[in-house]
Every structure is written in structure tokens, then in C-alpha cells.
Regions:
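Long, contiguous internal "core" modules enriched in hydrophobic/ aromatic residues
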Residues: 1-173
Length: 173
């Protein structure tokens, strides 16, 4: 499923950590609820509601095995960077193409865009200046366009500022 160099143990550990964190947070929430001076049935309702706040929390509360939640649920818990790393680590081009096809994109294009968006997200998350900046990584541009794409981005050399990234985001949304 993954390339040899792909650190799938890292992905599994990330998912385990998210589940463990969700379980610990739920336990802490339950302990706090026990200190409230409200009827027991209200406490139980609040605990039930809190157990369903996200799937990692729900899975840890509801199931003992298998250890890890289903893949579809794990995808919901991964960050953009983790999803980008996962996509780039897929071994078979057919798998990448299948995912990219759902977005009407070529697989190398999607991989490039995910990486670029991850870099931009990290710039924003660390409160760095984004405007009028060259992000350091240029996203690949489509060779042939089968979707709405700005005509001024048809030339390969004119895509080193934020307009390209905003166009990518617009297309993916």
C-alpha cells in the first residue's frame, strides 16, 4: 500500500496518539462533570453527549477492539500535513490517480498542491507574513485545463505568489 520509505508506523502512532488524547480528555471531562451539583441523570446525559464530540473520542469510549478506529474515521482526525504525507506515501499510482480523479485532477498535480497548501497553512499557523511573499514552493500547474482556471496562470513562470494558491483553494472548494 505504501512506498518502502514511507513511515507508516508514524501514521499509526499519530492515530493512536489522537485516540489516547481523546480518551484522556473524555476522562477529564467526566471527572469535572462529577463535581457538578446537578442530578445524576443530567450528568449521564452530558457524559453521553461529550463521548460523541468526535469519532476518536466516541470510538475509544464505545469499542475495545480493534485498537485503531476505522480508516474513514482516522482520515477525519488527520491534519492537512498528515494527509499530504499519506497521499505522497501511497505506493501505487493507481491509488493516487483514483483519489485525484475524484477532484478532476492529475495525481502529480494533487500531490504538489497538497504539499503547497500544507506549507501555506504552516505559514499562517505560525503567524508569519503571507502577503506579497514567495512561499518557497511553487505548486505545479495543470498542463491541460479541464476545469475553470485563470488564464493568466497558463504560463509556467508566473505563479510564484499567492494568487496561484488562492486559485487552487477556490478550485478545491
Amino acid at each position: 500500500l505504501f512506498k518502502r520509505r514511507y513511515q507508516h508506523d508514524r501514521l499509526l502512532q499519530t492515530i493512536r496518539n489522537k485516540q489516547d488524547k481523546a480518551r484522556d480528555e473524555y476522562q477529564r471531562d467526566c471527572e469535572q462533570l462529577e463535581t457538578l451539583l446537578i442530578p445524576e441523570e443530567c450528568k449521564e446525559r452530558l457524559k453521553a453527549t461529550r463521548s460523541r464530540e468526535n469519532y476518536a473520542r466516541y470510538y475509544g469510549h464505545k469499542y475495545n477492539e480493534p485498537d485503531l478506529m476505522p480508516g474513514w474515521a482516522a482520515m477525519e482526525e488527520l491534519t492537512l500535513g498528515e494527509l499530504s504525507f499519506l497521499y505522497s506515501g501511497l505506493n501505487r499510482d493507481a491509488d493516487k490517480k483514483s483519489i485525484a480523479k475524484r477532484l478532476n485532477l492529475a495525481a502529480p498535480l494533487l500531490e504538489s498542491w497538497l504539499h503547497c497548501l500544507t506549507v501555506i497553512r504552516n505559514i499562517c499557523a505560525h503567524h508569519a507574513r503571507l502577503w506579497n511573499r514567495e512561499p518557497g514552493i511553487k505548486p505545479k500547474l495543470p498542463k491541460t485545463v479541464s476545469f475553470p482556471w485563470p488564464s493568466n496562470l497558463q504560463q509556467q513562470e508566473q505563479h510564484h505568489r499567492m494568487f496561484t494558491v488562492l486559485s487552487i483553494l477556490n478550485l478545491l472548494m
